[in-house]
Swiss-Prot record:
CDD domains recorded: PTB_LDLRAP-mammal-like
Region annotated Disordered, chain positions: 179-201, 288-308
Protein name: Low density lipoprotein receptor adapter protein 1
Entries under InterPro entries matching the protein: Adapter_Engulfment-Domain (IPR051133), PH-like_dom_sf (IPR011993), PTB/PI_dom (IPR006020)
Keywords annotated in UniProt: Acetylation, Atherosclerosis, Cholesterol metabolism, Cytoplasm, Endocytosis, Hyperlipidemia, Lipid metabolism, Phosphoprotein, Steroid metabolism, Sterol metabolism
UniProt GO molecular function: amyloid-beta binding; AP-1 adaptor complex binding; AP-2 adaptor complex binding; clathrin adaptor activity; clathrin binding; low-density lipoprotein particle receptor binding; phosphatidylinositol-4,5-bisphosphate binding; phosphotyrosine residue binding
Gene name in the database record: Ldlrap1
Main localization, broad class: cytoplasm
General function of this protein: Adapter protein (clathrin-associated sorting protein (CLASP)) required for efficient endocytosis of the LDL receptor (LDLR) in polarized cells such as hepatocytes and lymphocytes, but not in non-polarized cells (fibroblasts). May be required for LDL binding and internalization but not for receptor clustering in coated pits. May facilitate the endocytosis of LDLR and LDLR-LDL complexes from coated pits by stabilizing the interaction between the receptor and the structural components of the pits. May also be involved in the internalization of other LDLR family members.
Length: 308
C-alpha cells in the first residue's frame, strides 16, 4: 500500500502533469489561483450549485448527446415550477460528493472511475453537466447543475477533468503493480519494492478510502432528502445514502467499469469535455475570488433557470 500511495503522491507532484493540465509556472499567484495547488485538488474543490435533475442517456459521451439531455432536464425543471435544490459539489481524485447545502446530508457519492463525460453546456451557458455509469444497474445518467455564471460552469468542468487525469494515472500505476505481483506469483519470486501477499489491489484501496490519502466521508447519520424537482424518464433522483452503505464497495467493479468507459473516450487518459481550447485557457486563469463577483446582466440568480 505504501508503494502505491507514494506513486500516487509522485504523480500529483509531477511537474509535467502540472504544466500540461494546469498551466504551471504561475506560482506567484498562489494561493489565489486554485489551478496551481495540488493540495486544493486533493482535499477537494467545493462548488455551491443548484441541482436541475437527471435523465438517462444512451452513450457515455458526446456534445450533442449531453446538449439534448440538458435541454430535457431544464425543460422538466421549468415545468415543475419548484425551487431548485441547493447542493454542494465536492470534486477530488476520488470522485464527486454531492451534499444538500441546507442539511449537509450526503446525497450521492460518484466514483471518478464511473464518470465518462462532463461539460459546460453551450446553449444553457450556466449549466454544468456530467455523465456517469450508475452503480445500481450500469445505466448511463446525465446530471445537470445550475451555476451562478458561465465561468463557474467552466471551472467545475475543468476541475473534474483534472481530478480524472490524476485518478487515471494512479489507476495505471496500481494496474502495473498488480501485474507485477501476479507475474511474481506465477514465477514464484518477489517483485522488488512490493509485498506479494499484503499489497492490496486497486479495488481494496478504493474500498478502504485510502486513495491518495483523502479524508474519509463523514459518518454522521443520514436521512432522506426530499426531491425538489421531477426528473426526466421518471427516474428517481439520487437518494441519500443510508447508515450501512459503503461508499466504496469491494465488489463495486470499478476496475472493470473504468476499463470499459476508457474504450469510449477519444483519449483513454483524458476525460472528454465540451470545453474549447479558449474555454480551458480562460478557466485556468480564474481565481475563486472571481466567482463571487456579480454578473453585469443583473439577473436574479434564484430565478435564472426560468430565463433560459
Amino acid at each position: 500500500m505504501d508503494a502505491l500511495k507514494s506513486a500516487g503522491r509522485a504523480l500529483i507532484r509531477s511537474p509535467s502533469l502540472a504544466k500540461q493540465s494546469w498551466a504551471g509556472g504561475r506560482h506567484r499567484k498562489l494561493p489565489e489561483n486554485w489551478t496551481d495547488t495540488r493540495e486544493t485538488l486533493l482535499e477537494g474543490m467545493v462548488f455551491s450549485l443548484k441541482y436541475l435533475g437527471m435523465t438517462l442517456v444512451e452513450r457515455p459521451k458526446g456534445e450533442e448527446l449531453s446538449a439534448a439531455a440538458v435541454k430535457r432536464i431544464v425543460a422538466t425543471a421549468k415545468a415543475s415550477g419548484k425551487k431548485l435544490q441547493k447542493v454542494t459539489l465536492k470534486v477530488s481524485p476520488r470522485g464527486i460528493i454531492l451534499t444538500d447545502s441546507l442539511t449537509s446530508q450526503l446525497i450521492e457519492n460518484v466514483s471518478i472511475y464511473r464518470i465518462s463525460y462532463c461539460t459546460a453546456d453551450k446553449m444553457h451557458d450556466k449549466v454544468f453537466a456530467y455523465i456517469a455509469q450508475s452503480q445500481q444497474n450500469e445505466s448511463l445518467e446525465c446530471h445537470a447543475f445550475l451555476c451562478t455564471k458561465r465561468k463557474v460552469a467552466q471551472a467545475v468542468t475543468l476541475t473534474v477533468a483534472q481530478a480524472f487525469k490524476v485518478a487515471f494515472e494512479f489507476w495505471q500505476v496500481s494496474k502495473e503493480e498488480k501485474e507485477k505481483r501476479e507475474k511474481a506469483n506465477q514465477e514464484g519470486g518477489d517483485v522488488p519494492g512490493t509485498r506479494r501477499d499484503s499489497t492490496p489491489s486497486l479495488k481494496t484501496l478504493v474500498a478502504t478510502g485510502n486513495l491518495l490519502d483523502l479524508e474519509e466521508v463523514a459518518k454522521a447519520p443520514l436521512s432522506t432528502v426530499s426531491a425538489n424537482t421531477n426528473n426526466v424518464d421518471e427516474t428517481p433522483r439520487p437518494q441519500v445514502l443510508g447508515n450501512n452503505s459503503v461508499v466504496w464497495e469491494l465488489d463495486d467493479g470499478l476496475d472493470e467499469a473504468f476499463s470499459r468507459l476508457a474504450q469510449s473516450r477519444t483519449n483513454p487518459q483524458v476525460l472528454d469535455t465540451g470545453l474549447s481550447a479558449q474555454d480551458i485557457h480562460y478557466a485556468q486563469c480564474l481565481s475563486p475570488t472571481d466567482w463571487d463577483k456579480p454578473d453585469s446582466s443583473g439577473i436574479d440568480q434564484d430565478d435564472d433557470v426560468f430565463t433560459f
